[in-house]
């Protein structure tokens, strides 16, 4: 509401304000307006690089909600143009492909998520699980559907090193125990 009022009062939003306004609209499920504001932010040259990459991720989530899957993927790829790939962005792209049962493409992106180093010094939003647990759990799923149960099990075990009490890990653990017997 603060940003809406600023705009209606004729104030020009700074790049930072435009970014946070777009995020706020997303969290209030105003997806079309969110994408519009995030695009305006991305057109501003003074935008912080980490915020530009994050804006692409948020815009992609809006597009998924709006059932514009192709545009969502375009935003995710655009996020790669602002900085070196992050675990978060690699996981988002991997999810795009795994949701469509394109397992080999998903494997590529989840493997990349494991290769990327988490860099908290950039000042961007860091989702620690995107650098270990999530890619491992998802690689386990991908390899299962690709028919390689051994690789699926290996990634399952690796996921457990990151989060031994994770809901997904424990659920998969029951499955692998039943298969191994």
Can you name each region flagged by the protein language model?
Residues 1-40, 46, 179:
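Catalytic-site signature of metal-activated, phosphate-bearing donor transferases
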Residues 11-12, 46, 50, 84, ...:
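Short coil turns that delineate tetratricopeptide repeat
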Residues 16, 50-54, 88, 127-129, ...:
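Start-of-helix register in tetratricopeptide repeats
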Residues 20, 58, 92-95, 138, ...:
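"A position-specific structural signal for the A-helix of alpha-solenoid helical repeats
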Residues 31-32, 69, 103, 149:
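TPR-repeat structural position
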